[in-house]
Amino acid sequence: MVRSLAKFVAVAALITGSAVSVKALNHKATPRRIDVEIEAHMGHYTPRVIEAHKGDTVHVVLKAMDTAHGFKVMGHDNIDITAMPGMPAEVSFVVDWDGGVEWFCTFNCGPQHGSMSGMIVATADEKR
């Protein structure tokens, strides 16, 4: 009787708990496309933070509002664009990292150039 009860409890645990856990572990969220329009002004970007998940495609349209401005993602040489007033620049990339990665202005746009940066914050796929 005790052995039968133990089997029943084990099977019930598998059906209710472990099966759900296995399903959750095997679940992969579908990558999204995130469209972001960034306005670059002397000394700052709007917005300054892009939130994404690892595996998402981010499409950035950079608009220079006063003078030329750049957008380069630290450690990713292929993510590097420059926009001029009235001439937006665009780039798309797949987020292939976890955590935060900085972007910064690559064009010496004036005295506040050094403060021109932002952050792409990526969370792991499991945290969706």
Which sequence ranges carry the predicted segments?
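Glycine-centered loop/turn positions within well-structured domains
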Residues: 43, 69, 99
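Extracellular/periplasmic metallocenter environments
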Residues: 3, 15-31, 84-128
